[in-house]
């Protein structure tokens, strides 16, 4: 049984937990983390979700996403999820989320990180992930169009790539999103 800590709308702990799969009570929130790992070519590591997984089964997704468990913060939850799902031990000690999405019942922290991994050597968690590979910005947008990638807003994918390329939410004239030719 997986337990999640609950927070109020200002992200203050409520000293309450909920069981994964239960409905989030009105006025309470739990933490979710997403990680986008980018390589030196500006490609994102993407994962293919298992066909039997609940929610977005048999679809491609960003590097990973998952809920933090009781006693974890976003950094420790991101570390655990990355180790569990892909077998990558990444040091999140000094990491901060690049952005937080506030959605009904959740605070969703997105980490944009560097990584040079060979997808063929990853230890994908068989209950969650069937495979992983690198993909560029334009390829991910095409995969969304083809209905094989979770249907994120394309402008959101644009923003993730731009934020990684610039290291900021603000554009800089000397840095552009790496589109394939």
Describe these PLM feature segments.
Residues 1-34, 38-40:
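Acidic, metal-coordinating catalytic segment for phosphate/diphosphate chemistry
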Residues 10, 39-42, 50, 114-119, ...:
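Short loop segments at secondary-structure junctions
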Residues 25-27, 55-60, 133:
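A short, polar/proline- and glycine-enriched secondary-structure boundary/capping micro-motif
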Residues 32-64:
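A glycine-rich, hydrophobic loop/mini-helix early in the fold
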Residues 45-46, 63-96:
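The catalytic Nudix box helix
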């Amino acid at each position: 049984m997986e337990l999640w800590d609950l927070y109020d709308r200002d992200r203050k702990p409520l000293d309450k937990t909920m069981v994964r799969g239960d409905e989030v009570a009105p006025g309470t929130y739990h933490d979710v983390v997403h990680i986008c790992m980018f390589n030196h070519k500006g490609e994102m590591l993407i994962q293919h979700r298992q066909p039997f997984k609940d929610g977005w089964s048999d679809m491609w997704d960003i590097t990973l996403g998952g809920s933090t468990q009781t006693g974890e913060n976003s950094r420790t939850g991101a570390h655990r999820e990355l180790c569990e799902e892909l077998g990558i031990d990444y040091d999140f000690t000094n990491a901060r989320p690049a952005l937080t999405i506030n959605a009904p019942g959740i605070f969703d922290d997105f980490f944009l990180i560097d990584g040079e991994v060979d997808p063929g050597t990853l230890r994908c968690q068989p209950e969650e992930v069937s495979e992983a590979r690198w993909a560029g910005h334009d390829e991910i947008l095409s995969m969304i169009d083809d209905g094989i990638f979770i249907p994120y807003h394309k402008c959101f994918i644009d923003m993730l790539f731009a934020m990684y390329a610039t290291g900021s939410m603000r554009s800089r004239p000397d840095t552009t999103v790496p589109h394939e030719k």
